[in-house]
Amino acid sequence: STICLWNCDQARKPTEAPKEEINELPHLAYSTLKGEPSTTRSLPGGSILILFNTDCDHCQREAQEIAEKSEAFKNYEILFIAADSVHHIENFAKAYDLANKPNVKFGRAEYQDVYKNFGSISTPAIYIYNRERKFVRSFLGETPVEELIKYL
């Protein structure tokens, strides 16, 4: 049987109040694109975590907008995580001109690890954390970049 954990969703669903379990950087294990193990807990303060699928139209548009407005995100580390193959993730990073941005990283996580930390989510799922590594706001689904910038 197949269980769908992530899906593309047009509707933007912001959550204003942080859930108690997402009040700081989660402990999501992932691998860098070079195969090195890491965890989202190692992210610095001032981070944006983006869970995405490489073939999701909404994720592609979100990445394009972030690349176009990358100057607004220069003081934040952005980590894109997908459960797709490393090859597909690398191609996504290159296609949207994010591969060589110093503050943008890409990683690969297992579906079950994402589900354990975030539950069933729509992609792109964007989580903003402040300098103290505390949760600020999440956005589920494609979101105008101007909305994200308001919370940086």
Located regions from the model:
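C-terminal motif of bacterial Sec signal peptides marking the signal peptidase cleavage site
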Residues: 4-7
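Short, internal strand/loop/helix patches
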Residues: 96-127, 131
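N-terminal "domain-start" segment that seeds a small globular fold
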Residues: 9-40
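Structural microenvironment flanking redox-active thiols in thiol-disulfide oxidoreductases
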Residues: 60-97, 111-116
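Thiol-/selenol-based redox modules, centered on thioredoxin-like
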Residues: 128-152
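Short active-site neighborhood of thiol/selenol oxidoreductases, capturing the structured segment around
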Residues: 39-60, 66
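A short helix-to-beta-strand connector/capping loop
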Residues: 23-26, 74-76, 100-104
